[in-house]
C-alpha cells in the first residue's frame, strides 16, 4: 500500500521562486528525447493525434526527420512533425497510385485531347445507340423508361415525352461543386455494348495538350439535349447543373444510381459510388477495377490541376463502375417487390424537375425588405422593452438569475478572488519591505518600484457576484438556459416538453415554444419578441445577401423520409468570381479563379420556415415576386392524406364510408365528429366554432378533435394518449371516451388498415407507399419480438393494455428498463411506418403533378416553376397566357393526373406576389374592372 502524503511547504520568497524556475529550465534542458516522447504520449491525446505523434516518432527514430523548433520538445511540435510526415507519405502514395493507374491503363479507355479526335468519338457513340436497339436487355430497360403512367397521361394532353432509344453512363470533372457557378473541365462516358469509355479534356490547368472547350461541348450538345438518349450519372442533379452552367439545355437526365441506391436501401453506410461499388463489387462484375477514390489519387484538390491522362483514366473507370452498378441496380429492382415501379414511375423524372425548381428561384423585392427591416426593428425594440416590463427584468432579476444558473461558479470565483486579493496584498507588503532594504541605485530597486506601482494601480475586482465572469449582466432571449429560467422558474409554466420529446425536460425549442405560445397568455410578450427576432435575423436581414449569380433567391430541395419536400439554404462561391461571358479566350483564366475560390458564401434560405400565419410573416413572403410580365399561379392538394386513407380503406379493406363522403362533397371530419361525439353536425363545423369562440355559447373544437382521433388511431395510441391530444380542444374525458370506443364500429376499415400496416412491419420490417416506395426500419422486427417476450412474461396482452404500466412491475428492474426502451423504439417505428404509407403516397402523387407541370407547363408553355412546398406547387405564368385556361390547367394537373377511388381536390389561386391570393373568379372579375393586368 502506497500513501501519497502532501505536506504544506513554507511559502517561498520571490528569489526562491526564481531559483526553482531556473532549476526547472535546467531539468528540461537535460531531458532526453526518449523521456520527451514518454511525456508526450502520457498527455491527453485523441486517437487521431496519437497516430500522428506515432508517425512523428517513427520518422525521427529512423533519422528521416529532425526537430523543427528549439527549446523544450512539445506536443504541438510532435503533432506538426507528424502532420508533415503523414502529408509527405500520402503524397508519395498518391504518386505511386497515379503511376500505377497510368501504367495499367486499359486498351478500351480513350482520353481525347485533340479536336481532330472528337468526330470519331461521336461516331462510336452513335454506333452504341444503334447496337442497343436490338439488344434484349436494353429493350427491357427502354420499356421501363417509356411505359409509365405519367407518359401516357401527358400523351392524353398532347404532350409527348420522346421514346427512349439509348442508355449510357456519364460524368463530369469540374472546377468545384457550386452548382450555379462552377464549370466543367472534362466529361466522360461509357458505351456498354462497345465496352469502351471516353474522357474529353478541355479545362485542365496544366501545360498538357487538350481540346478546345467550345468544340468539346458542341460535339456532344445535340446528344446531351436530346431527351430520347438517357444519360445516367451518380448524383445526376449535380452533373445536370454543370451542363446547364456550360450553356446547354440538357434533357434525358433520368437515371441516378445514387438516388436508386436510396430506393433500394436508404440505410447504406455511404452513398458514394466507390464505397457502393466496393461493397457490391462481385455481384456487379467489377472485380477487375481498383478501389481508388478521388482522394486516393488527388487528395482534396481539384482534378483540373492534374494532367488529362491521369484524370481521364480515373474518370473512365468511374463511368465503367457507374454503368456496372446501374445495370445491376435495375436487375435487382425488377426482382424486389415494386421497387422498379417506385423508381421508373416517378423518380426517373425528378432530377430534371427538381433542378428546374431550384434554379428558377424567386425575384426578391429588396427595397420592400429594407422597409420591413426598419419597421420590424422598431417593433423589436418595443417588444424587448415590453418583455422587460412584463417580467420585471431589472438588476434584482439578473442577480437572482445569475445565482440560480451560475451560483456555484460565482461562489467559487468569490472564494478564489478573496484569496487572490489577500495574495496581492501580501505580495505588495513583501515588495514594500524589500524596497526598504534595497539599494536605490540598483536595477532591482527599479523593478520593485514598478511592481509596487502595478499592484496599487491594477487592483483586483471586489469579490461580489456582479464582478464574477459568469455573472449575467443581460438576459439573452435566444439562450436556452435563460429561457428555461424565465419560463419554468419565474413564470412557473407547466413543463410539457414530453409532448414533443418523451426523453427531455424543460425544453425551449421552437416546437415546445409554439405549444406554450398557443396556451399560455403570460408568454405573449415572449411570443411577440420571438416572432420579430426570427423574421429579422433569419429572413429580412439575410435574404438580400443570400442571392445567387442571377440576382434571385434560390433554395436547395431535400426530401424527408416520407418523400415530402423541404428546403434549405446552401453554401456557394462568391458571385464576385463570375465572368460576364465565358469564351475560349478567357475560359482557362476563369477555371483557375473558380478552382481557387472557396465555397463559403451563405446563399438561399429555408422557405417553409417563413411564417405564413402571421401578418409580419405574410409581408415577408409578399416580397417574393414573379419576374416582370409574369404572375404567380399556385395550387395545393386539399386533404390529400385523409383521401389516401379513404382510398386504402376502400381498396384494401372494402370499407367505403370514408371515400363515399368525399364522393358526396362532404367534410368527413365534420360528419364523423357529429356521429362519434353525438352532437349536431352544424356545431362540429370550423365556422361555428370560430363564431362562438369567446362567447357564453363557446363549443369545443370538434372538427380538430376528430382530426386528432384519426392521427391517434393511425399511430396506435391508447385512449389516455388520445385524450391528452384533445384536451386543448375543450373535449371532456367522457366525450373523448365515447368517441374513442365508437370509432372502430363506425370505421372498421380504418383500424384494419392500421393493424395490417403494423402486421406487415412486424413481418418484413418495412412499409411502402401505394407506388411501392419503401421505408425500412432496421432492428424493428428483432426488437418487437423481444418486446413480445417481455409482455408475455408479465401478462400484457398488447401494447394498448390499459394495465400495461402496472403489469410491468412484475419484471426485474433491468428488464423493465429494457421494456420501456423497446416500447419507445417500436412505437416510433410504427408511427413512422403508418405515416409513410399515407404521407409518402401523398408525396408521390404530388411528384406526379410536378412532373406534369414540368413537361406540360415549363417545357410546353414556357412557364417558370418557382416552388414546391408541402402539398403546394407554384409557377410564374407569362401575363399573355393568364386566361381562364391557366387555372383550369392547374386544377387538372392537381386533380386529374392520378386517380384514386374518390375525387382529389385542390385550391388554386392567382398571386401578383406570394401570399397576395385571389381565387380565379376574383382575379378575372378584378381584371375586367381594371381593364386587364
Please identify what each model-predicted range represents:
Residues 2-204, 268, 280, 288, ...:
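Conserved "right-hand" nucleotidyltransferase catalytic core of DNA-directed polymerases
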Residues 169, 228-236, 632-634:
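Acidic beta-strand-to-loop metal/phosphate-binding motif
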Residues 177-178, 237-248, 260-264, 483-492, ...:
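Short active-site loop/helix that positions an aromatic residue
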Residues 190-194, 236-301, 328:
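Metal-dependent phosphoesterase core characteristic of DEDDh/y 3'-5' exonuclease domains
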Residues 193-231, 362:
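Nucleic-acid-processing active sites and adjacent nucleic-acid-binding tracks
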Residues 352-355, 359, 429, 560, ...:
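Conserved catalytic core of nucleic-acid polymerases
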Residues 476-477, 864-869:
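Short beta-strand
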Residues 878-884:
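Helix N-cap motif at beta-to-alpha junctions
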